[in-house]
Amino acid sequence: YSYASVILGESATAREGVELIGSLIDEQGVCSNDQIIIADNNETWLFAALSGHQWIAMKLADDIASLNPNIGNLTYNVDLDDTENCLHSEGIESMPKENGFAEYTDGKFDVAKTYGEEIGEAGMHQWSRYIQGRDYFMAPLAEGTDYEIVKDEREDARATTGALVHEL
């Protein structure tokens, strides 16, 4: 199914769209890890299909911009108990905990570390688009603090590749 077709045809609000897509993933599962923005005139949600029957959605504040250059970017500290601003699948923490791969930071369940992965060499170009987006919104990253530029030493690197940006 198409997320947009389902949401637009069945939901009156962004929150209803989140709840609808979440219920479909609860029931049927998902074979990909998609990240989509669901918005209406009153609120905007960042929805992430994580794995199998697991998903999470965070209500975005009015004063932020979300950059998603073809990468899922789960770097948020989320309060899973804040049902006003965070909706998620029932087993988002219990399933990975029961199966031994739940990750915790400072004693708190870490959605990003549990379901995400570091951006490897294959994702470096998406990361550079993320940095360009930050610059567009006048929130540039600082070289040496947020990233470093390194020479691309791969044998199959094209001459145009030059340097790659690596997240620190």
Regions found by a protein language model. Give the residues of each.
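C-terminus-biased signal that marks the final domain/tail of proteins
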Residues: V18, G22, G29, N41-T44, ...
